[in-house]
Swiss-Prot record:
It comes from Saccharolobus solfataricus (strain ATCC 35092 / DSM 1617 / JCM 11322 / P2). This is CRISPR system CMR subunit Cmr4. It comes from the Archaea. Pfam families: RAMPs. The gene is cmr4. Keywords: Antiviral defense, Cytoplasm. The lineage of its organism: Archaea, Thermoproteota, Thermoprotei, Sulfolobales, Sulfolobaceae. InterPro entries: CRISPR-assoc_RAMP_Cmr4, RAMP_III_fam.
Length: 308
């Protein structure tokens, strides 16, 4: 039986914040900050596909000026905005975010990674849709997430701590997952390697533990912990002549911290141009500027690709 697939190229990847990252949802009068980070329907930080695609497209046009025609074909032309592009990106789902930790029962870490069951379910949904719409199967990550989702407690992976205080105010009792495969898989995804080779389950990294523990929280407390991890910065605009604040020159911005991890994917229909773009341009891109703020040392991210 021949199975027809809609997408020929599916390239999932993690976005790791190298610096604090601000991808703005625009000016708000209802939020605690003037320029909040983009949020999904459950109020978790997210990076919408339009912002991600625009940033990657702008970066690639500068870095690969000799391949502008191919980039326009795959990501869309500025001169013909009504013409459908061959490729697209998914909204980037928050996968894990650093949270400050105070060890209560043996956990000796200044910070740990935190995620929630709801965020993992969203990543699972993306993986299942990619598996359905393409010939490529990303079963290793999907199986690892499914193993976690079978639980219903606050979990810690890669540490035996029984409890922890997160972001100064949240005392959490923990259950440990003793699963070397999940530990090594997530360890590679989160910290250690740029890519994870799904076909090599017996790789040298198989016995490694996470460089930082991963705590999976119930949704009832997880969103509050994550919200407390966000960084809110007040900024001012100074009159150079008088060294005073300009009228209306005081505002606040919201950032996700260094080492935050988002999950997304590039999807494209098959063509010679798409093949060249995916393998010779996009997959070779490791660092880019996302959300602006590069003039104040913000917005640098690293792309960590999953191997097919």
């Amino acid at each position: 039986m021949i199975i027809m697939t809609y997408y020929t190229f599916v390239k999932p990847f993690f976005i790791k914040a190298v610096t604090h990252l601000h991808v703005s949802s625009g000016t708000s009068v209802e939020e605690e900050v003037d320029l909040p980070f983009q949020r999904d329907e459950l109020n978790y930080p997210t990076i919408f596909a339009s912002s991600l695609k625009g940033a990657i497209k702008s970066f690639l046009l500068k870095e690969y000026s000799n391949a502008r025609e191919i980039i326009y074909k795959v990501l869309g032309s500025d001169e013909n905005p009504d013409e459908a592009s061959l490729g697209s990106f998914l909204d980037a789902v928050l996968f894990a975010i650093p949270a400050r930790s105070i060890g209560v029962s043996g956990l000796d870490e200044a910070w740990v990674y935190v995620t929630t069951y709801e965020l993992l379910r969203k990543v699972k949904s993306l993986l299942e849709s990619m598996n359905t719409l393409s010939a490529t199967q990303f079963t290793s990550l999907l199986d690892a997430i499914n193993n976690i989702l079978q639980e219903s407690k606050n979990l810690i992976i890669s540490d035996n701590a029984a409890s922890v205080i997160l972001n100064e105010d949240f005392y959490v009792e923990l259950s440990n997952i003793q699963n070397e495969y999940i530990q090594s898989l997530l360890g590679d995804m989160l910290i250690e390697n740029s890519t994870y080779n799904q076909s090599n389950q017996n790789s040298q990294s198989q016995g490694n533990h996470l460089v930082k523990p991963l705590i999976v929280l119930k949704d009832s407390i997880g969103r509050e912990v994550i919200n407390r991890s966000l960084i809110r910065v007040r900024r001012i605009k100074i009159k150079r002549s008088s060294k005073t604040v300009e009228e209306g020159g005081l505002w606040s911005e919201e950032y996700v911290p260094v080492n935050s991890l988002f999950f997304s994917s590039f999807l494209a229909r098959g063509s010679k141009d798409t093949a060249y773009f995916a393998d010779c341009i996009l997959r070779k891109t490791r660092y880019l500027i996302l959300g602006g703020k590069e003039t104040i040392g913000k917005g640098i991210v690293e792309l960590r690709w999953l191997n097919d």
